[in-house]
């Protein structure tokens, strides 16, 4: 696994300008469900228009910021709960090296997990499993993390995320299993941190269970800031959403994370504020590799790339786009552009 990850150490770092530029000309793992027609929130044609730059992305920035903030926390918790280390969480795998040009995947990482055998089956060993296993084995896995803002978490992988995981597995030959990690985080004030179910109920519904872990996210300005830090965990829902949208401007702030179970705010310069978090659900769902997945789906990716090239090369991109759209598919509408971001929330 380590040798494989090292192959891509010089690839564009995730969320860098070079990474964004590469993704504009490729079908990434997160695009795949839409391209295959499996995403109920975003169609092949909306994805095509987005890649062809026919409209300005209307992302749900609050939900994007939330997912980015808690991806790091989820990795820390995965390492703690499974006694492992996540690597390769910043690489970009270009499918060209495996014969799939135009397709890529940017995994959330790779790690080793311990599987324990009991009652004629294998399960993922965590610090919460108080089980004496008949046998154990350590295997490398691909990691895919989601942290929905308010969407309910079910004990299964949403169908529109499965292509992203299978894409990552297909482009990672040494790996035969992935894990889908989905966590339910809730915001709280610093005074609410600890072994209790107190959260900011203006932002989230009340919780009846106790948290698995908690911690603090600290937000610092990149400029000199001398005002007293604010406890963002006590904000009302709308103001907190506005804060998340502001954090989307990454050049204005730096984000710092406490270790899990920390309750004391860190002392550092230019702190604008902080908020507490608690995690109440942390699911780790195994996903086995489908050996033929990418080979079977690649012709659709190729068709998408041909359509994209045709639009970009046209002197009238929008007119060409409309011709490419299926007869039953209307051209871009404001509703379509807005609706696909609902998946993030």
UniProtKB/Swiss-Prot annotation:
Keywords assigned by UniProt, alphabetized: Host cytoplasm, Host-virus interaction, Inhibition of host NF-kappa-B by virus
A Pfam family per the record: YqaJ
InterPro entries referenced in this protein's UniProt entry, alphabetically: NF-kappa-B_Signaling_Reg, PDDEXK-like_dom_sf, Restrct_endonuc-II-like, YqaJ_viral_recombinase
Gene Ontology CC: one annotated term: host cell cytoplasm
Keyword Lipid metabolism: no
Keyword Ligase attributed: no
Gene3D superfamilies: 3.90.320.10
GO biological process entries: symbiont-mediated suppression of host NF-kappaB cascade
Signal peptide interval: none
Subcellular location: Host cytoplasm
Top-rank taxon, per record: Viruses
Record text on subunit structure and interactions: Interacts with IKKA/CHUK and IKBKB.
Function (record text): Plays a role in the negative regulation of host NF-kappa-B signaling pathway. Mechanistically, recruits IKKA/CHUK and IKBKB to suppress their kinase activity towards NFKBIA.
Similarity comment text for this entry: Belongs to the asfivirus D345L family.
Name listed for the protein in its UniProt record: Protein D345L
